[in-house]
Amino acid sequence: MTIKTIAFQGRPGAYSDLACRTARPGWRTLPCKTFADTITAVHEGKADQAMLACENSLAGRVPDIHTLLPNAGLHIVGEHFQRVEHCLMAIHGAQLEDIKRVHTHPVAMGQIHTLLKTYNFTPVIEFDTAGAAELVALWNKKEEAAVASELAAELNGLNILKRNVEDAAHNTTRFYIAARTTDRLSVNTPDVMTTVLFEVKNTPGALYKVLGGFATNGINMTRLESYMTAGSFAATRFLMDVEGHPEDTHLSKALAELEFFSESANILGVYQQSPFRRQMKRALSDAAPNTTTDAIAG
């Protein structure tokens, strides 16, 4: 049996690598230097799919994806949400009191302020969380530590001194999963997500007209982001995620209005939602106050 391959941007042990292993257990993972290299690996047949980080609950959107995907000849075939659980790691034998410097990616460094302040560690920026773990293992010095994933510690033979050192417990990264071909989902498939890239004229009310159909047709929009194009400071390109299948009556009408009022529109993918979305909805529902009970009790 041929083992399938999924490509990701980063070093072995990066959170993208962890996302690949979680979403596609049993697949071979292929590390790539850049997002462009990751997409090229799939386009050239070196990998079956690509795991592409698109947004983080703390850091916001991941740049470049909106410019790379439309011209890559790939389809978004799925999504994955990966909890980011930072671990403080060092060589075996090192204790917390030995650590002087902490190495990690700048985004991760911005998520561990409490750790740095509590232990008065000196922060040192590196190109990658997993790359920082590789360096700490290579240097083999007790005073050096890295903040990265548990997988990075395992792959580099490092000892985890503290787990979950991130400031926010809800730190989660969302990924698009892209492939050369896609299985066409039936309009009756439950929990479908559609990703659309579109451009509007730089005129007053253009975006309002484009999006009006989604409101009137009751379509839930989960993501809308603007981008500058061609060196212009005018935001005319938008990336949008909406719930529903393009052939569903309501979404079909909304997309027809979008196409009528926009300069261009391109569906990047139609895929099933991650189970993470249902879990989040249940969690929010459970956390919502019961106004009836509160009123009676009050």
Residue positions per predicted region:
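Domain-level signature for soluble enzymes in the chorismate/prephenate branch of the shikimate pathway
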Residues: 1-298
